[in-house]
Amino acid sequence: MVYIIKKMVKGEIYYYLNHSVRLDGKVKTLSHYLGKGPFTQYEIESLLKEKSQMILLEAEFLKIFSRKLNYKEHLLPLSFINILERLKEINRIMAPFNKSYFEKFEDNLRLRYVHGSTAIEGNTLSLRDAQLILEEDTPAGNTLREMYEILNYKELFKFMRSYTGDINLKLILKIHETLMKNIDDENAGALRNIDISISGTDYDPTPSPVIEDEINSLIDWYKGKKHFTPPVELACAFHQKFVEIHPFIDGNGRVSRELLNFILIKNNYPRLVIPFERRGVYLRCIDIGNTGDLIPFIIFISGLLIEDSFKPVATFFEQLKSKIIDENYSSEISLELDNTINDYKEILDIIKGMEGRIEKLNLSELRKGKWK
C-alpha cells in the first residue's frame, strides 16, 4: 500500500511517500521525499496519484534484484538464466510506462510469428500479405491453403487470449483443429492413426497406437517439471519431445511452436519469433535434439529472445535510467540495471558469434568470462 506521511521538524511540515515491500522474508519501507508543506488535501491527493507509480516501480526492481533462483533442474548456467529472468521482469514492468509502444510491438511480434511459423513449413506469402490477411481479412496468396494457414492464426489468437488453463490433450487438439481448419478438415484436431517417417532425418516418430499415451506422458512430465525448471528450458524441451512424437499427420511444427510460446507467455515471457531466415539453424537444432542434446536449441531460442523479443528493454533503457535518477532511487538499483544491460549486450554478442557454427553451440563457449 502506498501512503503519505508527514513529519514535523522544528515547526516545519515535510511530506514523504511511503510503501512497504517484503524482501527475503523481511519488510523494507521505501520512502520518497515529496516536499515541504503545508499541502492542501487536493495537493496531497495529486502527489499520491502522480508519484505512486514510481515508488511501486522501485519496489518491483528491488524484488527482481533480490530474487534468488531456486530451479532444481537446469542445463544452462544459473547466471545466464538469471539474466533472462531479469530481462523478462524488466520488460514486464516497463510496459505500463510505454503502453502504446508495447502494444504495437506485441502486434508486430504476433504478425512476424505467424509469418515465420508458416514460412518455415513452406508458405510463400510475404510479411505484407500476412498482415493484410490478419488485419484486414484481405485475400492474398497463390493458393487458398496459404491464405488459410495465415487466417487460422487469427481465430487461434482469439481463443488463446481467453484460455486460462494449462497444457492438456484437449488444448493440443484444439490448437491443431484451429490451425488446420479449411486445410485438412478430415484430420484437423485428430491424432494420426498411421505410422509416418520424416524425410531428411533418421528419426522415426512414435508409432500411431501409442501416440495418445505418449502425449499424456509428455503432459505429465511437463506438470512435474514446470515448477523446477527454467521456463525457456522447459519450453524448448517440451517442443523437442512433442516434435519427436509427431502426433499429427500434418501441422506438427506449427502446433509445437504454439505450445513453446504458450509456456513462455504463461511465465510472463514475450512471444518468440523464429523467422524464416533462421529456419536452417532451427531445424538443425531439432536434429541435434533428437540425439538427446538440447543445449544448442536452448541457446538458439535464448538468443532469439534476447535479440528480438527483449528489444524494448534496450530501446527504453536510457529513459528508464533517467526516471530512476529523477526519483532518487537507491544507487543499488541503478547499479544493478547497468549490470543487467551490460550482461544483455555481452550475451547477445556471444550468441551471435556462436549461431553461425551451430554444431559448436555448447556450454564451454557460453561459459566464457562470468557465465559459469
Regions found by a protein language model. Give the residues of each.
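FIC/Doc superfamily catalytic core
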Residues: 1-250, 254-372
